[in-house]
């Protein structure tokens, strides 16, 4: 079964970190990403762009309305995502636990939300 992992961060907490701490934190991510990739269960992993570039599209009166920024104002924001293909819920938790946002970044408000996918359309 496939699962999507949403990697969250708290912009205010992340912005309050010293640049040297941010660099030290981010420098640890590639090794954890590679550990996850080495399982052969990672379908895709992505880091999302800056919030200033986000757009929300909504149907309104038969037309599509485009709004700048994230859909909701929230304390935590999705900063990345991944999709894994796990044989069981326990394996999904183990795999998601390898993601940097699940193991590092407490000071930046990092967290992972793991969600089973009901539908997945591959290209």
Whereabouts are the PLM-identified features?
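Conserved, structured core segments of small domains
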Residues: 1-123
């Amino acid at each position: 079964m496939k699962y999507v992992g949403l990697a969250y961060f708290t912009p205010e907490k992340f912005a309050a970190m010293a640049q040297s701490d941010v660099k030290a934190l981010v420098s640890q991510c590639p090794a954890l990403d590679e550990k996850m990739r080495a399982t052969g269960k990672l379908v895709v992993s992505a880091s999302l762009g800056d919030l200033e570039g986000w757009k929300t599209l909504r149907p309104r009166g038969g037309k599509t309305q485009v709004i700048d920024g994230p859909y909701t104002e929230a304390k935590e924001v999705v900063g990345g995502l991944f999709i894994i293909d796990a044989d069981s819920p326990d394996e999904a938790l183990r795999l998601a636990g390898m993601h940097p946002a699940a193991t590092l970044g407490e000071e930046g408000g990092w967290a992972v939300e793991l969600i089973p996918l009901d539908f997945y359309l591959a290209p």
